[in-house]
């Protein structure tokens, strides 16, 4: 129950052309009803209850439920920085960070079972360099730890040469698919997640993928996938879509262009307001710092600020608390879901809110 053979072949071909740039074996792909199912079953197969998955913070909040509800695996938020300025050039994860996490987990009497990286990252939009991925890979293999890279935003990339944002990028880091490292290493400890929901804007169709060269893992995945399968009709429709190579090439290019234009609208306003943010290279988000507006350095104050912004300005951000980071007052802004005009209106409202707060008039 890994998915229809024709669909998996079409998915492998699509990913080879647009994401991985290396050959994928369709027999090593598992297809499930969305990214949540893929994450949940991967965790269930690879981990025992009480094992620990290490995830650099800030991270996607629902990882906690996705990895824990079925398998009982715990999430460890690995703090690698405090200020946003420390990750303006990209994620700051180092081997020293991994060693520190391993020491703390062992001290607690638990097992460091899995390292999860999202690339491009949610919520920061940062991209792990080839060298960072390689160092993490070698460390995980040396320590017998599973490394999973989630490339769900791998085709949602920002054009860093855009005139409004190009000054933010001093290093020419480009997206490098983890599949290439997997191909070179041929290790049972390396796995790749992908889903079509974000890059293709089809969240409701619920189609996620796992790619692994671990034959025992793939067999187990097929055994437990029965209740998580994607409907034949959905697989057929998406197979036809992926097979239209001219359309898909045009779509991917246009999507990145429009994503960049919307991102530039956000950054133009943040620069004018001098609000700290992390320069994104991909994903659908901007990670920004509104801590100056907190009445006190607490989670409660962050929640109050989040609610005040929504009630008084009609702008809904994602508060930072669930992302597992140490600093209060950080928020995630999701920008691709509306037109540039409406996005501009939202940013004007955010600007007005910030200015009123600074002047003490609200």
PLM regions: where:
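Conserved active-site segment immediately N-terminal to the catalytic lysine
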Residues: 149, 162-197, 217-220, 315
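Hydrophobic residues in well-ordered beta-strands that form the structural core
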Residues: 55, 77, 149, 317-319
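Helix C-cap/helix->beta junction micro-motif
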Residues: 142-143, 273, 313, 357
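Conserved PLP-binding catalytic core of the aspartate aminotransferase-like
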Residues: 256-260, 264, 273-312, 337
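PLP-dependent aminotransferase class I/II
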Residues: 189-282
């Amino acid at each position: 129950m890994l998915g229809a053979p024709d669909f998996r072949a079409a998915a492998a071909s699509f990913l080879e052309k647009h994401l991985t740039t290396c050959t994928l074996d369709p027999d090593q792909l598992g297809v499930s009803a969305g990214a949540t199912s893929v994450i949940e079953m991967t965790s269930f197969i690879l981990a025992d209850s009480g094992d620990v998955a290490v995830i650099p913070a800030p991270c996607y909040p629902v990882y906690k439920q996705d990895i824990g509800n079925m398998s009982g695996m715990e999430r460890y938020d690995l703090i690698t920085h405090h200020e946003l300025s420390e990750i303006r050039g990209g994620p700051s994860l180092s081997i020293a960070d991994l060693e520190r996490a391993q020491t703390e987990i062992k001290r607690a009497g638990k097992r460091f079972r899995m390292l999860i990286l999202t690339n491009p990252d949610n919520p920061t939009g940062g991209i792990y360099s080839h060298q960072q991925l390689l160092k993490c890979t070698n460390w995980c293999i040396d320590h017998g730890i599973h490394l999973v890279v989630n490339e769900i935003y791998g085709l949602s990339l920002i054009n860093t040469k855009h005139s409004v944002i190009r000054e933010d990028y001093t290093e020419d880091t480009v997206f490098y698919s983890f599949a290439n490292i997997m191909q070179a290493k041929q290790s049972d400890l390396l796995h790749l997640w992908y889903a079509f929901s974000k890059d293709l804007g089809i969240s409701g169709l619920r189609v996620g993928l796992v790619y692994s060269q671990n034959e025992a893992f793939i067999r187990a995945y097929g055994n437990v996938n029965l209740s998580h399968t994607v409907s034949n009709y959905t697989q057929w429709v998406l197979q036809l879509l992926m097979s239209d190579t001219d359309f898909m090439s045009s779509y991917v290019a246009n999507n990145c262009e429009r994503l960049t234009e919307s991102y530039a609208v956000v950054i133009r306003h943040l620069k004018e307001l001098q609000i700290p943010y992390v320069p994104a290279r991909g994903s659908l988000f901007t990670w920004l710092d509104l801590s100056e507006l907190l009445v006190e350095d607490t989670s409660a104050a962050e929640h109050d600020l989040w609610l005040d912004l929504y009630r008084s300005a009609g702008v809904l951000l994602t508060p930072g608390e669930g992302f597992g980071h140490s600093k209060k007052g950080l928020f995630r802004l999701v920008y691709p879901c509306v037109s540039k005009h409406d996005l501009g209106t939202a940013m004007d409202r955010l600007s007005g809110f910030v200015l009123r707060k600074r002047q003490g008039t609200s």
